[in-house]
Amino acid sequence: MEQQEEKRKIKAYQRKSKRSKSGSSSIPLDLVSEILLRLPEKSVARFRCVSKPWSSITTEPYFINLLTTRSPRLLLCFKANEKFFVSSIPQHRQTFETWNKSHSYSQLIDRYHMEFSEEMNYFPPTESVNGLICFQESARLIVWNPSTRQLLILPKPNGNSNDLTIFLGYDPVEGKHKVMCMEFSATYDTCRVLTLGSAQKLWRTVKTHNKHRSDYYDSGRCINGVVYHIAYVKDMCVWVLMSFDVRSEIFDMIELPSSDVHKDVLIDYNGRLACVGREIIEKNGIRLWILEKHNKWSSKDFLAPLVHIDKSLSTNKFLLKGFTHAGEIIYVESMFHKSAKIFFYDPVRNTSRRFELKGFTDDEFVLSNEHGYTLHVFPNHVESQISFT
């Protein structure tokens, strides 16, 4: 009995000595993974440098996919001179105050800025797609990860034109992002496609089957592995909805539900694509045209609550920016100076809440631009630890 106990102690000592000599952590790697998943994205990126095993964990596709299942956030950006300011706020209801509790938040979360040239083109040409955003600076196409603050400059597509419309898609089956681009100055039956993360960053030519051109200000919308954008088909002299299956790289043409829809506003409504009608319905509401199965459309009317709560909150001063995954409509001030207002409206509960951003800009920028700044909003943004290095 004593000999068995002695052997057990010797084996325990040998295991401990082995761990000590190897210098490895005594924390099991699966527990390390659980701990890292509970940390903010900034901390995850920082702990990547602790050791090779930790770096391996945070760059594994499985770990990266788990990060995207966290509660989505509202990503906020604006450009002032050569500085590009970035912040984000949670979307879940517990964070905000209702209308009958007048309250303003004055501190932003993780505000930082990046330097860009004055030649930075219209922003943003794409939405946030599984944590990544693509935009254009001068003649360069750039993929941006707001979580890691990394930028990836893509090779220039063939052709001399800089007049490009850019789309970003994500295939949830294979876990791949793809960048699409086409010229908007003329009609074409081809599109250029590049797969991120491939060994060779090469643009491929994909046939669209229908000669069309997209609108420069159309950022498209990627939903369940399909990128949608509104396009003009010259041969038919009609505006249509084009779909691009990210995995199969096949285009399809879908008839629009009405000729009177906003051509620059596409929305993810409960996991389905929706267009916003231009017509004014009863009580200043909005009409959504929702794409159903077999490319059929249904319509749904929503009350626009702003003018009913406060007459000074005209819908002309606020823009519809989409829906949260919880079904709330997001309104954002079209222009702001030192503070910006964001409103959330739940049409089912008939409740509203607001978030006021104070101190978003420095005094020097407020004084230098009397017309104000445009706040770019990315609903349902998820964290991503995809690395470009």
From Swiss-Prot:
Residues 21-66 form the F-box domain. SUPFAM superfamilies: F-box domain. Pfam families: F-box (PF00646), FBA_3 (PF08268). InterPro entries: F-box-assoc_dom_typ3 (IPR013187), F-box-assoc_interact_dom (IPR017451), F-box-like_dom_sf (IPR036047), F-box_dom (IPR001810). Residues 1-26 are annotated as: Disordered. Residues 9-21 have a biased composition (Basic residues). CDD domains: F-box_AtFBW1-like. This is Putative F-box protein At3g10240.
